[in-house]
Amino acid sequence: MKLATVPVLIFSVFCGAAHSAPAVTDLKWAEVLNAEHRSEQNRSRDQYRNPLQTLIFFGVQPCDTVVELWPGGGGWYTEVLAPIVSDCGKLYTAQFANDSDVAFYSKARASFEAKLAAAPAVYGKVELTTLQPPKYSEIAPAGTADKVLTFRNVHNWLKAGVAENVFAAAFKVLKPGGILGVVEHRADADASLEVMVSSGYVSEKQVIALAESAGFLLLDSSEINANSKDNHHHPKGVWTLPPSLRLGDKDREKYLAIGESDRMTLKFGKPVHE
């Protein structure tokens, strides 16, 4: 994808902020990714979710204030982010509302809370907030976050009709020069909104439009999470593929051979001067 040109002065501010912070060491990455609090099942998905390469691409640093949007009931990325920033940074997890009318959301929130409570040495400093627009959108103090990250959630926000609210909330909490990192199942470029909502795949054009409407600049993209075996067209949408495998045993080996979905990885910046 051809990226829009970012003004040199603005881009240098984003880069300068990243280079001035202490980096996560290779030893720390290895320690976190192989830690006992990560289940074997979750670690087995590293080959598809590429947490090391993805978080390095987004520029996550140990002293960052990070907001993770909708970590879900399992908190897959929370397992990695929490220990990375625990020493001198801060992690906010903007979760589903516990008073949601949607049973899935309230159940996932309860599962996530139990996960945090069960491992205080890992998650004791994590601050749990609520993201359920339009009722809840105060996900962290305004202008305090270095990074806001979301993994495979945009299709859910589109379906709920709250995508614009979420991107606005992300913009609000970021510092000037802060980074919004988005990983999402990637649809064909010409996919309609109806197809995106039903399939779980979203076009890059759609994500970029949402981010830019909120005030963000597209800084970079990566193929870290791409999967050329995935043609984006399956009977049960993205949930046909692992780990969901919605068709059960039907064509199971076929979909296991494809692997997890083809995903975009986009990095946006909040301008220093709005």
Regions found by a protein language model. Name each.
Residues 82-83, 163-176:
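A short glycine-rich, Lys/Arg-flanked "PGG" loop and its adjoining helix->strand segment in the class I
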Residues 92, 177-185:
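Conserved beta-strand signature within the Rossmann-like core of class I S-adenosyl-L-methionine
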